[in-house]
Amino acid sequence: MIKWLQRAGCLSAHAVVPQAPAAASVQGRHDLAFDTISNARDLGGLAGAGGRRVRQGRLYRSGNPALASAADLERLQTLGLDMVVDFRSPGEKSPEEAAFGQRFHWVAAPVLEGSMAMDVLMPRLRASTPAQMDAFMLEVYGDFPVRYREAFAGFMRTAQGGKTLLFHCTAGKDRTGFAALLLLAALGVAQDDILANYLESNQRNAQFNQTALARMAGLGVAPAVMTPLLEVRASYLDASMRAIDAGWGSVDNYLRDALEVDVAQLRGHYLAG
């Protein structure tokens, strides 16, 4: 699946992904006006199978919404969400988030359980080089379709029910990005558009990332070491695709055989036109 890298103009695993989103993604996205929920967007508008487009107002992705402002929570409630799917592990959550679960049907589907907790990450970050952190992220993405297959299968089963969904992790880029790949691939969205949607996180999280770099520098983590953890890179998504190709031969096979997705049913729910 090296074409994912070539199309993004990113032939090196260490190359920095361009910050500007691709035109196809700009045309297909529907921005959400949140002040305290990062990386939030509607997947509606992207071109899918058979000349149809992904329905707006049905599939949303974001960073963690659970500590949002009161105004943003009110805005979130207007979306008519049937369910909010959280890919974070228990160690990434705080007690202050409990109130969110009282307002929304909030379902845990933990991926990378334990791996992203700060007490686990900090020793790794302090001991690693930028190249080692890049390799760590490639390993993480390679694990998504294999080690965490059941979590993503459960997510796809939920989507197959035709629910209006918001799905998120912490920054809405890695676990959420892979989940978006699965959904959009099942809906027949072109690989270029899937990749462009994935890479948008760099622009959308730019302020979040700068704040994180400054905070972590104060804790003894060099910006160059932290950057691979904060960015999305075409090479990361390619690691997932390579794992899928190695185990199942194609994304279509993975969706059908590993996740048992009914693609026709999904398209009936989420494609318009």
UniProtKB/Swiss-Prot annotation:
SUPFAM superfamilies: (Phosphotyrosine protein) phosphatases II. Keywords: Hydrolase, Protein phosphatase, Signal. It comes from the Bacteria. Its EC number is 3.1.3.48. It catalyses: O-phospho-L-tyrosyl-[protein] + H2O = L-tyrosyl-[protein] + phosphate. It is an enzyme of class 3 (hydrolase). Gene3D superfamilies: Protein tyrosine phosphatase superfamily. GO terms for molecular function: protein tyrosine phosphatase activity. Pfam families: Y_phosphatase3. PROSITE patterns: TYR_PHOSPHATASE_1, TYR_PHOSPHATASE_2. Residues 1-15 form the signal peptide. Transmembrane segments: none annotated. Belongs to the protein-tyrosine phosphatase family. This is Putative tyrosine-protein phosphatase H16_A0669. It comes from Cupriavidus necator (strain ATCC 17699 / DSM 428 / KCTC 22496 / NCIMB 10442 / H16 / Stanier 337) (Ralstonia eutropha).
